[in-house]
């Protein structure tokens, strides 16, 4: 009975990590496509030029792909070294997530202050030749979230000139509508809009985060269960 349960656990872990690995491959592909087609897409901060949406997706995709590969191969081959590596990688990711969350809440005011400062400095790159991705990202955010600038529409005056904002800041978008127009604009800054979006969707985001946490803990538990079984028997069990 125990042997049958462990056999089921082995293949369940293999299947789960195979899906995990495929998702990682997909994310890596999307990240590479964004990097090639959009350049530094969503590189809002000049202080961290490598921290673009494309690079983040590539990094996350690579981590997911490597983790899924370790779990997949470790489960199907009943390899203790791979299973232990899978456990350690998940543990490091879990600890890193917890540390980042704690630091974020402890230094929330400083994070907000520095983020606004960096984003405003990033606006200066809006019309630069090598940052078409940043321009597209700002245009999409302002059009979709009905906002303008970082704190308000006046942030653009230092970039585009007095009384001039991107056309996507207009309530009714048209060619040249952002020039000498300070009335029919979205007046709320995008930073507050994004914060409000997170606040409005905190329950959904919390649920997703909890599901990820449970998935990581289960992955660690399953891998250690298989590891201990293989360690005790000293050989593979027949599947």
From Swiss-Prot:
Key words of the record: Glycoprotein, Membrane, Transmembrane, Transmembrane helix
Pfam family, one: Tetraspanin
Compartment(s) of residence: Membrane
Record: glycosylation sites: 180-181
UniProt xrefs under PROSITE patterns: TM4_1
Family according to the record: Belongs to the tetraspanin (TM4SF) family.
Subunit description: Found in a complex with GP6.
Name of the protein in its database record: Tetraspanin-9
Native species: Ovis aries
């Amino acid at each position: 009975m125990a042997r049958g349960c462990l056999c089921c656990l082995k293949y369940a872990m293999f299947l789960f990590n195979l899906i995990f690995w495929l998702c990682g491959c997909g994310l890596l592909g999307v990240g590479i496509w964004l990097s090639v087609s959009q350049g530094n897409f969503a590189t809002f901060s000049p202080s961290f030029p490598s921290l673009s949406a494309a690079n983040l997706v590539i990094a996350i995709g690579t981590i997911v792909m490597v983790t899924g590969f370790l779990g997949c191969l470790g489960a199907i081959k009943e390899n203790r070294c791979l299973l232990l590596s899978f456990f350690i990688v998940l543990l490091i990711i879990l600890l890193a997530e917890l540390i980042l969350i704690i630091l974020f809440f402890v230094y929330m005011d400083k994070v907000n202050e520095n983020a606004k400062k960096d984003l405003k400095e990033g606006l200066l790159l809006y019309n630069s030749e090598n940052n078409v991705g940043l321009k597209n990202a700002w245009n999409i955010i302002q059009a979709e979230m009905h906002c303008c600038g970082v704190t308000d529409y006046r942030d653009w005056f230092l970039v585009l000139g007095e009384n001039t904002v991107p056309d996507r800041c207009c309530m009714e978008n048209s060619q040249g509508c952002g020039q000498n127009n300070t009335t029919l604009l979205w007046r709320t800054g995008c930073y507050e809009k994004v914060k409000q979006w997170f606040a409005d969707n905190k329950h959904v985001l919390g649920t997703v985060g909890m599901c990820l946490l449970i998935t990581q803990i289960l992955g660690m538990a399953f891998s250690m269960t298989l590891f201990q079984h293989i360690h005790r028997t000293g050989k593979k069990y027949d599947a």
